[in-house]
Amino acid sequence: MAQAGSENKEPWNEETRAKFEGKSRSEYLDPCQEAAQRSIRCLHRNQGDRTMCSDYFEAYRECKKQWIERRREQKRKAGALF
């Protein structure tokens, strides 16, 4: 099975928060983009065989999950309704 790498960089940290809050509304920011790119590269290396890349997909899902949870937490702390 493919190795997803040993990096466990927090997707929602102060640096990411500052970038996210400082961007324009039309600009897209995904702190999990690196994990997404690894998944795509794995698919290319393995001729589209998703079973060979399951670790990469799981790392991406976990990154997104952490990011969304941290965003919700930040909004709750800030008292935002949405």
From Swiss-Prot:
GO terms for cellular component: mitochondrial intermembrane space; mitochondrion. InterPro entries: COX23, Cys_alpha_HP_mot_SF. Residues 29-71 form the CHCH domain. A motif (Cx9C motif 1) lies at residues 32-42. Its main location: mitochondrion. Residues 1-27 are annotated as: Disordered. Residues 7-27 have a biased composition (Basic and acidic residues). Keywords: Disulfide bond, Mitochondrion, Transit peptide. It is found in: Mitochondrion intermembrane space. Disulfide bonds join C32-C63, C42-C53. A motif (Cx9C motif 2) lies at residues 53-63. One of its GO terms (biological process) is mitochondrial respiratory chain complex assembly. Required for the assembly of cytochrome c oxidase. PANTHER family: COILED-COIL-HELIX-COILED-COIL-HELIX DOMAIN-CONTAINING PROTEIN 7. Belongs to the COX23 family. This is Cytochrome c oxidase-assembly factor cox-23, mitochondrial.
